[in-house]
Amino acid sequence: MTKKRIAVIGGGVSGLSSIKCCLEEGLEPVCFERSADIGGLWRFQENPEEGRASIYKSVIINTSKEMMCFSDYPIPDHYPNFMHNSHVLEYFRMYAKEFGLLKYIQFKTTVCNVKKRPDFSTSGQWEVVTEHEGKTKVDVFDAVMVCTGHHTNAHLPLESFPGIEKFKGQYFHSRDYKNPEAFTGKRVVIIGIGNSGGDLAVEISHTAKQVFLSTRRGSWILNRVGKHGYPTDVLLSSRFTYFLSKILGQSLSNAYVEKQMNERFDHEMFGLKPKHRAMSQHPTVNDDLPNRIIAGMVKVKGNVKEFTETAAIFEDGSREDDIDAVIFATGYSFDFPFLEDSVKVVKNKVSLYKKVFPPNLERPTLAIIGLIQPLGAIMPISELQGRWAVQVFKGLKTLPSQSEMMAEITKAQEEIAKRYVDSQRHTIQGDYIQTMEEIAEFVGVKPNLLSLAFTDPKLALKLFFGPCTPIHYRLQGPGKWHGARKAILTTYDRIRKPLNTRETEKSNSMVSAVTTGCFMLAVVFFAIIMAYA
């Protein structure tokens, strides 16, 4: 029987994992990558080509290595918990080499058009038109996986800033920022307080004369480093914390999170406190911003009302003169011009079942992979989406009816609108654990905690109270990995490894406290398990 051929569009993180997902299910992937190398967003270039995602030289990832790794390929234990972009790219190269993925990628190949074949209603096949070195080619594929991400088109709303066309200084989108030396001794306005805006404000403040960080709403600032020095995402991303948040509800959960954030620094005193609650916006992850604010190197300002030739006038009436540069850290938009009408994007919104499948196709042979902005790591979600998609392509899993999918999409969009502030940043928002657990159930790889509580209680405790790492979804079912159990039980060893660069005397009181805590957690765990039995 001839293998099904799958077109994978994009050779970034989602594309690499999708190639591997195809191979695991005996499919034949052909990946098209418009640039000359893998890595997508995480491959730094001084002058990236148009339409390609871009990062600045100093970027450090906001999710820790245990939460962002591929599910059957842990990141080396000596790597730092929060990796520089060069380490991230190096890990992707190791992954591609380990599983032999590069031979399936056609580099310097642009996908121009993807359209249904005339017999699509019965075959589900697609015609894919590509261009390589000036030559056009048409291929037929049994399914298509779109892995182009959502950081390609810079969102630059200049129409919202009257007078910017008269401004005599330099202005550009954060996509084009590379290093701080160009701003030495200058007065710089940064518009937007997302992750890029916060990072740029901190970095440029080390060379600039003054940085003004302009924010329309304000933001809650989340530390990478949490209690006792462990990564914050490791501490927050457990089934227990997710279970607890559902019991407490949004109001109490918000109150707790805001209290924790304000214990680090008072957001109101620093001029950062927004009107919305902490869990109503994607958080800004930044360890250094409050230090630069309290040192006076970064001044927080409100929204810019207008620009003059040399000044920025803010909505509160204040004015800053002699501005040399304005950087718009205003995010990105996405589209799929090569898909024609198969997937429509309206105001940065797209209708996809579980953020993967278009509901209006006669055959479920098109999947959008990685089009999500999670409260957590995106890499493991992309991988799990790919594992689900290839099962659907093979007919091993089926999707609900079109009406059922549309009803679920409408419900999901209403929930996003209810929870989050209205922003194009939140149109593809998703919760890490909820998304992973839901798709894992579709794939057949969601851990059975009730069964494990009796057969392997040590592991069950780790699965419930420990960080919900991607490796959890290799314990059972399709794609089971024999090393999963050991990798889960040694999670904290890998977290501590890069920090153990000097011997210190261990505290007995700490060991005792940990032992007591583990015992109490075990009691709580079995009480919950028995309640659900």
UniProtKB/Swiss-Prot annotation:
Phosphoserine is found on 54, 58, 280, 401
Q: Which GO terms describe its biological process?
A: lipid metabolic process; regulation of cholesterol metabolic process; xenobiotic metabolic process
Where can this protein be found? Answer: Microsome membrane; Endoplasmic reticulum membrane
| GO molecular function terms attached to this record | aldehyde oxidase activity; flavin adenine dinucleotide binding; monooxygenase activity; N,N-dimethylaniline monooxygenase activity; NADP binding; NADPH oxidase H202-forming activity
Q: Which residues bind NADP(+)?
A: 196-199
Key words, A-Z: Endoplasmic reticulum, FAD, Flavoprotein, Lipid metabolism, Membrane, Methylation, Microsome, Monooxygenase, NADP, Oxidoreductase, Phosphoprotein, Transmembrane, Transmembrane helix
What Pfam families does the database record attribute to this sequence? FMO-like
Entry binding sites for FAD: 10-14, 33, 41-42, 62-63
Q: Which residues carry this modification: Phosphothreonine?
A: 284
Record-level GO cellular component terms: cytosol; endoplasmic reticulum membrane
InterPro entries in the record, alphabetically?
A: FAD/NAD-bd_sf, Flavin_mOase, Flavin_mOase-like, Flavin_mOase_5, FMO-like
Question: Which spans are transmembrane here?
Answer: 510-530
Instruction: Please name the top-level EC class of this enzyme.
Output: oxidoreductase
What does the record give as cofactor? FAD
UniProt EC number: 1.14.13.8, 1.6.3.1
**Organs and tissues of expression:** Expressed in liver.
Question: Which catalysed reactions does the entry list for this protein?
Answer: N,N-dimethylaniline + NADPH + O2 + H(+) = N,N-dimethylaniline N-oxide + NADP(+) + H2O; NADPH + O2 + H(+) = H2O2 + NADP(+); heptan-2-one + NADPH + O2 + H(+) = pentyl acetate + NADP(+) + H2O; octan-3-one + NADPH + O2 + H(+) = pentyl propanoate + NADP(+) + H2O
Phosphotyrosine: residues bearing it: 56
Q: Which residues carry this modification: Dimethylated arginine?
A: 5
Query: This protein's superkingdom?
Result: Eukaryota
Family to which this protein belongs:
Belongs to the FMO family.
Q: Which PANTHER family match?
A: DIMETHYLANILINE MONOOXYGENASE
Please explain the role this protein plays, according to its UniProt record.
Acts as a Baeyer-Villiger monooxygenase on a broad range of substrates. Catalyzes the insertion of an oxygen atom into a carbon-carbon bond adjacent to a carbonyl, which converts ketones to esters. Active on diverse carbonyl compounds, whereas soft nucleophiles are mostly non- or poorly reactive. In contrast with other forms of FMO it is non- or poorly active on 'classical' substrates such as drugs, pesticides, and dietary components containing soft nucleophilic heteroatoms. Able to oxidize drug molecules bearing a carbonyl group on an aliphatic chain, such as nabumetone and pentoxifylline.
Protein name per the record: Flavin-containing monooxygenase 5
Q: What is the lineage of its organism?
A: Eukaryota, Metazoa, Chordata, Craniata, Vertebrata
Its encoding gene is what? FMO5
